[in-house]
Amino acid sequence: MSDFYVSLIPTDVNWQPTSKAAAEAEAYVRRVFPDPDGVQQDVTVEFYDRITAVDAGENIQRITCPRCDHDIPLDWYEDLIEQTEGEFDSPNVTVPCCDTAAGLDALKFDWPSGFARFEIAVANPVRGEYEFTADEAGAVAAILGHPLRQVLAHI
């Protein structure tokens, strides 16, 4: 069975909110993503010690280099994630297409993806509109005090 995730991550890969702000954001997300049965979906808040991949999973079909605009082979990215277990000390990698350094957060994914040390996610949302609206994402950003990026994943 497949799982679907809708996540919000900071636009700065190293930024983390306060625990209090994260708890307030979680409470807000639970209100806008109600789960009447209490068993279908799961809301999680994660503070990561290292920069962590938060990608679109099976939705990713194409990655483009921010330096030379050539396609980056998906198997290169999959190998990178496997080798690092999706965790990074540095936000920079050497891309295979032009053998230059690029920021992880600068890689151009066809489905929004990112890298972060904080994530708030809803697994298998049950409401009709499964992603955050612009207003909802903006409200979470205001609670946390930092701009956010939305990631829709199919795992």
Predicted regions and their residues:
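Cys/His-rich zinc-coordinating "finger/knuckle" motifs
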Residues: I72-D75, D105
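Residue-level signal for mature regions of secreted extracellular proteins and peptides
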Residues: A56-Q61, F88-P91
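N-terminal alpha-helical interaction blocks
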Residues: M1-N59, I155
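Short linear interaction motifs
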Residues: V45-Y48, W76-I81
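Short linker/helix segments within small regulatory modules
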Residues: D79-V95, D110-W111
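Short cysteine-rich clusters marking metal-coordination/redox-active sites
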Residues: C65-C68, V95-C98
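Domain-exit/linker segments immediately C-terminal to small folded modules
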Residues: P96-I155
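Acidic (E/D-rich), amphipathic helical modules within compact regulatory domains
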Residues: I63-C65, L74
